[in-house]
Amino acid sequence: MSSTVTATDVLRDAYGRIRDALPGLIGRLDDRTLLWRPDRDANSIGWLAWHLTRVQDDHVAGVGRVQQVWTREGFHDRFGLPYEVENIGYGQTSAEVGAFNVTDVDLLVGYHDSVHTMTMRVLDELEAASADGGSDGDSGYARVVDAHWDPPVTVAVRLVSVIGDAQAHLGQIGYLRGMAQRR
């Protein structure tokens, strides 16, 4: 076994921690707690779990140039939300957040599990492309995925950004859970 730790190893670990944390945070919560909002403009636990998974699905699928799990595996239909298929929750109004009504923890966790599996596949492909040296200039972690920023956003930056976003939302879920259980 090699003692070398690669960027892919670190990313796998970070995404694995997200995957491991979510069920423990939302499991066994009742419907009321999943949808509770501390005020009319706040996000609910259920919405945050959905949103962090939608962002990971959207961004990692984009990096991997694959179809999102949301549509490929029919989660858009299973969730039955009143949002456009491409909606990931970013910039939603308070009314749109309030329209989130999913209380099926197994569905939320199952969607995240499927996104995690896709994420691991994309990381495997990126590792192979990086090992190849990215000789075509369009593969691996250095590939630019969004040139609208200065500096342009690379695959590596996008993947780390998704991790940071998900970790922030997991913290919000934990905080909301504590608040909801004390009301």
Question: Which residues are covered by each model-predicted region?
Answer:
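Acidic/histidine-rich alpha-helical segments that form the ligand environment
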Residues: 82-140, 160
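Short, contiguous alpha-helical
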Residues: 12-16, 23, 33-89, 124, ...
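A short alpha-helix capping/helix-coil boundary motif
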Residues: 2-4, 98-100, 144
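Extreme N-terminal tail/first-helix region
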Residues: 1-14
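Detector for methionine-enriched segments
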Residues: 1, 118-120, 179
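Short, conserved clusters of charged catalytic residues that mark active-site
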Residues: 6, 103, 107, 154
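Hydrophobic alpha-helical core bundles mediating ligand binding, dimerization, or RNAP-core interactions
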Residues: 11, 15, 19-22, 26, ...
